[in-house]
Regions:
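Helix-loop-helix hairpin linking two adjacent transmembrane segments in secondary transporters
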Residues: 20, 24-63
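C-terminal membrane-cytosol helix-exit motif in multi-pass small-molecule transporters
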Residues: 53-74, 267-272
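Cytoplasmic helix-loop-helix junction between adjacent transmembrane helices
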Residues: 1-24, 208-209
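Helix-to-loop junctions at the C-terminal end of transmembrane segments
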Residues: 149-160, 245
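Core transmembrane helices of Major Facilitator Superfamily
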Residues: 1, 194-206
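Structural signature of the two symmetry-related core transmembrane helices
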Residues: 52, 163-178
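Pair of pore-lining "gating" transmembrane helices in MFS-fold secondary transporters
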Residues: 95-112, 193
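Juxtamembrane intracellular "pre-TM" segments in multi-pass secondary transporters
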Residues: 69-102
Length: 277
């Protein structure tokens, strides 16, 4: 789906991909609320049937777009030709340094995101926040990210992807490292909102840059590689944070993970500067 959006909007990829990721995020925000309400008021069957109906509606809308499909690149029948083409696509993307370094910035951001999801609730409770306040921290982060992605995508179309990726990583690092030094609910709200904004800046710009840096015939492979690297980062965040918190402290753990984001920003800047020569 990301590759389709990137292919349709070549001139306004930042805005288009920012809007796309915001829409997917709105689904993840609305799903638990709507599903929980339906399960409570009408039962699990109604909740799951409703989810299925929404999925069918999405399929119908997609097919009504009547998109022009490129001819298949693999004409031979069987699994072997398909696997061979997949291997070629993976190798081509793996050699693309722009795609790899850009994906690594998303991974660094997602390490912090995963760590926040796992341990911000525990930290919040340890400084005296209640469960409702902890939930509001995540809501503010998600809403800020949701509202910022389309806007920052448009900005990246005008000013370029690279400066925004660097700025977003630094914002994420600064807000992330500050959280375990704060016990005030109001300040934690500000920091959570700031992290959500930085996350939106990185996500909208990095997706567009990966699309810009991928060959047309490898666009899907490039976007897939970015998604895989992001998922690895997101899954690694709780594990890394847990090990660090167990051996040092919240402050030390958050400092190390913030340092990873700064290192990713430096590596991204240095690599892109080298490749542009």
């Amino acid at each position: 789906a990301l590759a389709t959006v990137a292919d349709l909007y070549k001139e306004r990829r930042g805005a288009a991909l920012g809007t796309y990721t915001a829409c997917t995020q709105s689904g993840s925000l609305l799903g638990p609320f709507l599903g929980g309400w339906l399960a409570y008021t009408a039962g699990f069957s109604t909740a799951f049937v409703t989810a299925g109906v929404f999925g069918c509606i999405a399929i119908l809308i997609f097919f009504r777009l009547h998109l022009d499909e490129p001819p298949p690149r693999v004409r031979e029948r069987g699994l072997a030709p398909v696997m061979a083409e997949m291997g070629k696509g993976f190798l081509a993307v793996a050699r693309n340094r722009k795609v790899l370094i850009t994906s690594s910035t998303d991974a660094a951001k997602m390490v912090a995101n995963g760590a926040l999801m796992a341990f911000l609730p525990l930290y919040g409770l340890s400084v005296g926040l209640n469960a409702g306040q902890v939930g509001l921290l995540f809501s503010v982060q998600a809403v800020t990210s949701f509202l910022s992605k389309p806007v920052m995508g448009r900005v990246s179309d005008r000013v370029g992807r690279q400066p925004l990726i660097l700025a977003g990583l630094l914002i994420c690092a600064a807000t992330f490292i500050s959280m375990p030094h704060v016990g005030s609910f109001a300040l934690l709200l500000v920091l959570s909102s700031g992290f959500g904004f930085g996350e939106a800046v990185v996500s909208s710009s990095s997706a567009a840059l990966v699309a810009d840096s991928s060959e047309f015939k490898r666009l899907g492979a490039g976007m897939g590689m970015q998604g895989t690297v992001m998922d690895i980062g997101h899954a690694s965040g709780p594990l890394l944070a847990g090990l660090l918190i167990a051996h040092v402290s919240y402050q030390g753990a958050f400092a190390v993970i913030a340092g990873l984001q700064i290192l990713a920003a430096i590596a991204f800047w240095a690599t892109m500067r080298t490749l542009s020569r």
